[in-house]
Amino acid sequence: CFGIQPLIMMTWARKNKPEMTQQLADATTKVGNEADAMVIPVGLAFAEAIKQDPKLELYRADKTHPSPEGTYLEACVVFASMYHRSPVGLKYYGIEQVEEKTAHFLQEVAWNTVCEYFDWKK
């Protein structure tokens, strides 16, 4: 209706429950397909970033909410999904600091995750 497509954000697993990732991915994808909505695969990007760099801290102390790095990764995945463009090279203007090297890594993870999820060519 009116050329609008709903978006559903796939959330991330809690830090101490990484096994939730696939359950969240499957459930969100199913709902997205049923609702003809675009699913934004943030949870898969979190899992991939942690897989590639287990020391990266994407969570706040509560092990649920995102750290500045987690929030930045989320923003990169949303950008890539909505605009079909790579976030690699975008400037970071957040209030809380994310190191440039880390920001670049998160941009790469976001783009690769989105391309894989939607089966896009890079």
Regions found by a protein language model. Name each.
Residues C1-L7, A37:
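A short helix->loop->beta-strand "cap" motif at the edges of active sites that frequently abuts
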Residues M10-K17:
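Surface-exposed cleft-lining segments at the edges of enzyme active sites
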Residues K17-W111:
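Catalytic His-Asp segment of secreted/periplasmic serine-dependent ester chemistry enzymes
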Residues W111-K122:
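Long, charge-rich low-complexity segments
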